[in-house]
Design a protein with these regions (language model features):
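Noncatalytic, beta-rich nucleic-acid-contacting surfaces in large DNA/RNA-processing enzymes
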Residues: 1-252
Length: 252
Protein backbone atom coordinates (compact mmCIF):
# COMPACT_ATOMS: atom_id res chain seq x y z
CA UNK A 1 0.00 0.00 0.00
CA UNK A 2 2.83 2.40 0.85
CA UNK A 3 4.48 1.83 -2.53
CA UNK A 4 1.15 2.40 -4.27
CA UNK A 5 0.79 5.85 -2.75
CA UNK A 6 -1.51 4.84 0.08
CA UNK A 7 -5.12 3.70 0.06
CA UNK A 8 -8.10 5.02 2.00
CA UNK A 9 -5.70 6.73 4.41
CA UNK A 10 -2.65 8.83 3.62
CA UNK A 11 0.70 7.03 3.33
CA UNK A 12 1.66 8.46 6.71
CA UNK A 13 -0.84 6.28 8.52
CA UNK A 14 0.18 3.00 6.88
CA UNK A 15 3.71 3.79 8.01
CA UNK A 16 2.35 4.62 11.46
CA UNK A 17 0.54 1.27 11.62
CA UNK A 18 3.74 -0.54 10.65
CA UNK A 19 5.51 1.22 13.52
CA UNK A 20 2.73 0.27 15.95
CA UNK A 21 3.18 -3.38 14.88
CA UNK A 22 6.87 -3.27 15.81
CA UNK A 23 8.45 -1.99 12.62
CA UNK A 24 11.45 0.33 12.93
CA UNK A 25 10.94 3.19 10.48
CA UNK A 26 13.99 4.72 8.80
CA UNK A 27 13.77 7.71 6.50
CA UNK A 28 15.32 7.55 3.03
CA UNK A 29 18.98 6.54 3.32
CA UNK A 30 21.64 7.07 0.66
CA UNK A 31 23.13 3.58 1.18
CA UNK A 32 20.11 1.49 2.18
CA UNK A 33 17.05 2.85 0.39
CA UNK A 34 15.86 2.07 -3.11
CA UNK A 35 13.06 3.71 -5.07
CA UNK A 36 10.34 1.80 -3.20
CA UNK A 37 9.86 1.43 0.53
CA UNK A 38 11.63 -1.79 1.57
CA UNK A 39 11.52 -4.12 4.56
CA UNK A 40 14.76 -5.58 5.98
CA UNK A 41 13.81 -7.76 8.94
CA UNK A 42 11.97 -5.36 11.27
CA UNK A 43 13.49 -2.25 9.70
CA UNK A 44 11.51 -0.38 7.06
CA UNK A 45 13.52 1.97 4.85
CA UNK A 46 11.34 4.56 3.17
CA UNK A 47 11.92 4.76 -0.56
CA UNK A 48 13.43 7.66 -2.48
CA UNK A 49 10.22 7.92 -4.50
CA UNK A 50 8.45 9.32 -1.42
CA UNK A 51 10.62 12.46 -1.49
CA UNK A 52 8.64 15.27 -3.06
CA UNK A 53 10.05 16.52 -6.39
CA UNK A 54 13.12 14.25 -6.29
CA UNK A 55 13.83 13.43 -9.94
CA UNK A 56 13.46 9.83 -11.10
CA UNK A 57 16.75 10.22 -12.95
CA UNK A 58 18.47 11.08 -9.66
CA UNK A 59 17.12 7.93 -8.02
CA UNK A 60 18.30 5.84 -10.97
CA UNK A 61 21.79 7.36 -10.85
CA UNK A 62 22.14 6.67 -7.14
CA UNK A 63 21.05 3.05 -7.44
CA UNK A 64 23.17 2.32 -10.52
CA UNK A 65 26.28 3.90 -9.00
CA UNK A 66 25.81 2.08 -5.72
CA UNK A 67 25.41 -1.23 -7.55
CA UNK A 68 28.46 -0.61 -9.72
CA UNK A 69 30.90 0.72 -7.13
CA UNK A 70 29.46 0.02 -3.72
CA UNK A 71 28.19 2.11 -0.85
CA UNK A 72 29.03 5.78 -0.52
CA UNK A 73 31.58 6.43 2.21
CA UNK A 74 31.18 10.18 2.63
CA UNK A 75 29.42 13.16 1.12
CA UNK A 76 32.59 14.00 -0.80
CA UNK A 77 32.66 10.43 -2.16
CA UNK A 78 29.02 10.78 -3.23
CA UNK A 79 29.74 14.15 -4.86
CA UNK A 80 32.75 12.84 -6.76
CA UNK A 81 30.86 9.87 -8.20
CA UNK A 82 27.58 11.40 -9.31
CA UNK A 83 26.29 14.27 -11.42
CA UNK A 84 23.18 15.48 -9.64
CA UNK A 85 21.57 18.90 -9.60
CA UNK A 86 21.90 21.03 -6.48
CA UNK A 87 18.15 21.02 -5.79
CA UNK A 88 18.04 17.23 -5.59
CA UNK A 89 21.21 17.10 -3.50
CA UNK A 90 19.62 19.56 -1.07
CA UNK A 91 16.47 17.44 -0.88
CA UNK A 92 18.55 14.40 0.06
CA UNK A 93 20.43 16.40 2.68
CA UNK A 94 17.29 17.89 4.22
CA UNK A 95 15.65 14.46 4.55
CA UNK A 96 18.89 13.31 6.29
CA UNK A 97 19.70 10.68 3.67
CA UNK A 98 23.42 11.06 4.54
CA UNK A 99 22.92 10.66 8.30
CA UNK A 100 24.94 7.43 8.53
CA UNK A 101 28.08 8.79 6.89
CA UNK A 102 28.42 12.53 7.29
CA UNK A 103 27.96 15.94 8.87
CA UNK A 104 24.82 17.62 10.07
CA UNK A 105 22.35 18.98 7.53
CA UNK A 106 23.55 22.56 7.95
CA UNK A 107 27.15 21.58 7.21
CA UNK A 108 26.18 19.44 4.22
CA UNK A 109 24.01 22.17 2.73
CA UNK A 110 27.01 24.47 2.94
CA UNK A 111 29.27 21.84 1.36
CA UNK A 112 26.79 21.21 -1.45
CA UNK A 113 26.55 24.92 -2.24
CA UNK A 114 30.33 25.24 -2.23
CA UNK A 115 30.81 22.26 -4.54
CA UNK A 116 28.10 23.49 -6.89
CA UNK A 117 29.73 26.92 -7.16
CA UNK A 118 33.12 25.34 -7.85
CA UNK A 119 31.59 23.15 -10.54
CA UNK A 120 30.02 26.10 -12.36
CA UNK A 121 33.46 27.69 -12.82
CA UNK A 122 34.96 24.76 -14.65
CA UNK A 123 35.77 25.16 -18.31
CA UNK A 124 34.74 21.72 -19.51
CA UNK A 125 30.94 21.67 -19.54
CA UNK A 126 30.69 18.21 -21.12
CA UNK A 127 32.49 16.09 -18.55
CA UNK A 128 30.66 13.00 -17.37
CA UNK A 129 31.05 13.61 -13.65
CA UNK A 130 30.45 16.80 -11.72
CA UNK A 131 33.15 16.56 -9.12
CA UNK A 132 36.17 14.79 -10.63
CA UNK A 133 38.43 17.74 -9.80
CA UNK A 134 39.22 17.39 -6.09
CA UNK A 135 37.51 19.90 -3.85
CA UNK A 136 39.68 21.14 -1.01
CA UNK A 137 38.44 19.76 2.28
CA UNK A 138 37.83 22.22 5.09
CA UNK A 139 37.18 21.80 8.79
CA UNK A 140 33.61 22.78 9.53
CA UNK A 141 32.21 24.09 12.77
CA UNK A 142 29.70 21.55 14.06
CA UNK A 143 26.19 22.89 13.52
CA UNK A 144 23.79 20.18 14.66
CA UNK A 145 20.24 20.31 13.37
CA UNK A 146 17.36 20.19 15.82
CA UNK A 147 14.81 17.36 15.83
CA UNK A 148 12.01 19.86 15.25
CA UNK A 149 13.81 21.15 12.13
CA UNK A 150 14.16 17.58 10.87
CA UNK A 151 10.45 17.01 11.50
CA UNK A 152 9.36 20.07 9.53
CA UNK A 153 11.71 19.17 6.67
CA UNK A 154 10.17 15.70 6.63
CA UNK A 155 6.68 17.22 6.57
CA UNK A 156 7.64 19.32 3.55
CA UNK A 157 9.46 16.56 1.65
CA UNK A 158 7.52 13.43 2.66
CA UNK A 159 4.22 14.97 3.66
CA UNK A 160 4.47 13.82 7.29
CA UNK A 161 6.91 13.88 10.23
CA UNK A 162 8.98 10.85 11.18
CA UNK A 163 8.42 11.51 14.88
CA UNK A 164 5.29 11.54 17.02
CA UNK A 165 3.39 14.68 15.91
CA UNK A 166 2.59 15.42 19.55
CA UNK A 167 6.30 16.23 19.98
CA UNK A 168 5.81 19.23 17.69
CA UNK A 169 3.36 21.03 19.98
CA UNK A 170 4.87 24.24 21.34
CA UNK A 171 3.61 23.41 24.83
CA UNK A 172 3.24 19.62 25.00
CA UNK A 173 0.48 18.39 27.27
CA UNK A 174 -0.32 15.07 28.87
CA UNK A 175 -3.81 16.25 29.74
CA UNK A 176 -6.83 14.43 28.42
CA UNK A 177 -7.63 10.76 28.28
CA UNK A 178 -6.11 8.17 25.97
CA UNK A 179 -7.96 5.73 23.74
CA UNK A 180 -7.34 2.94 26.26
CA UNK A 181 -9.11 4.97 28.97
CA UNK A 182 -12.37 5.52 27.10
CA UNK A 183 -14.07 2.16 27.86
CA UNK A 184 -13.99 3.15 31.54
CA UNK A 185 -15.87 6.38 30.84
CA UNK A 186 -18.90 5.23 28.83
CA UNK A 187 -21.66 7.87 29.02
CA UNK A 188 -19.37 10.51 30.53
CA UNK A 189 -18.16 13.78 29.01
CA UNK A 190 -14.38 13.67 28.62
CA UNK A 191 -11.56 15.52 26.88
CA UNK A 192 -8.93 14.00 24.62
CA UNK A 193 -6.21 15.31 22.33
CA UNK A 194 -6.11 13.79 18.86
CA UNK A 195 -4.01 14.05 15.72
CA UNK A 196 -6.34 14.16 12.72
CA UNK A 197 -6.25 11.07 10.52
CA UNK A 198 -9.30 11.59 8.35
CA UNK A 199 -12.66 13.33 8.34
CA UNK A 200 -15.80 12.26 6.49
CA UNK A 201 -18.48 14.78 5.57
CA UNK A 202 -22.11 13.73 5.59
CA UNK A 203 -25.56 15.29 6.00
CA UNK A 204 -28.56 14.72 8.22
CA UNK A 205 -32.05 14.14 6.81
CA UNK A 206 -32.47 17.91 7.15
CA UNK A 207 -29.39 18.46 4.97
CA UNK A 208 -27.34 19.81 7.86
CA UNK A 209 -23.64 19.07 7.59
CA UNK A 210 -22.02 16.78 10.14
CA UNK A 211 -18.72 14.93 10.37
CA UNK A 212 -17.26 11.58 11.31
CA UNK A 213 -13.64 11.85 12.39
CA UNK A 214 -10.72 9.55 13.11
CA UNK A 215 -7.84 10.74 15.29
CA UNK A 216 -4.74 9.29 16.95
CA UNK A 217 -4.06 9.81 20.64
CA UNK A 218 -0.55 10.67 21.82
CA UNK A 219 0.28 6.95 22.14
CA UNK A 220 -0.71 6.33 18.53
CA UNK A 221 -4.07 4.61 19.03
CA UNK A 222 -7.24 5.42 17.11
CA UNK A 223 -10.20 7.42 18.41
CA UNK A 224 -13.39 7.73 16.36
CA UNK A 225 -15.57 10.82 16.75
CA UNK A 226 -18.99 12.05 15.65
CA UNK A 227 -19.47 15.80 15.15
CA UNK A 228 -23.13 16.76 15.09
CA UNK A 229 -24.31 19.76 13.00
CA UNK A 230 -24.24 22.41 15.74
CA UNK A 231 -20.73 21.41 16.82
CA UNK A 232 -19.56 21.18 13.20
CA UNK A 233 -20.61 24.81 12.70
CA UNK A 234 -19.11 26.09 15.96
CA UNK A 235 -15.88 24.08 15.87
CA UNK A 236 -14.95 23.28 12.27
CA UNK A 237 -12.15 20.85 11.49
CA UNK A 238 -9.88 23.09 9.43
CA UNK A 239 -7.09 20.73 8.40
CA UNK A 240 -4.28 18.54 9.64
CA UNK A 241 -3.14 19.03 13.19
CA UNK A 242 -3.78 18.14 16.81
CA UNK A 243 -7.24 18.92 18.18
CA UNK A 244 -8.60 19.24 21.70
CA UNK A 245 -11.79 17.18 21.61
CA UNK A 246 -14.56 17.19 24.20
CA UNK A 247 -17.58 14.91 24.03
CA UNK A 248 -19.59 12.07 25.51
CA UNK A 249 -18.11 8.59 25.26
CA UNK A 250 -20.39 6.16 23.44
CA UNK A 251 -20.03 2.43 22.92
CA UNK A 252 -20.87 0.94 19.54
Amino acid sequence: IINNGGGFYRTEFYIHEARMQGGEIEGPCINNSVAETTLYGKTIYLGFSLIKDLQASTIQKILEERKARGAFTSFHDFSSRLSIGLDDVNRLIRIRAFRDIEYSKTELLWQAQRIDQATKHRDDQHQQRMFQTPIQQVNLVELPSLPVEDAFDAMELLGFPLINPFELIANPTKAGLLAKDLPNHIGKVVSVYGYLVTIKNTSTIHRDRMLFGTFLDREGYFIDTTHFPEITKRYPVIGRGIYHLTGKVAEE
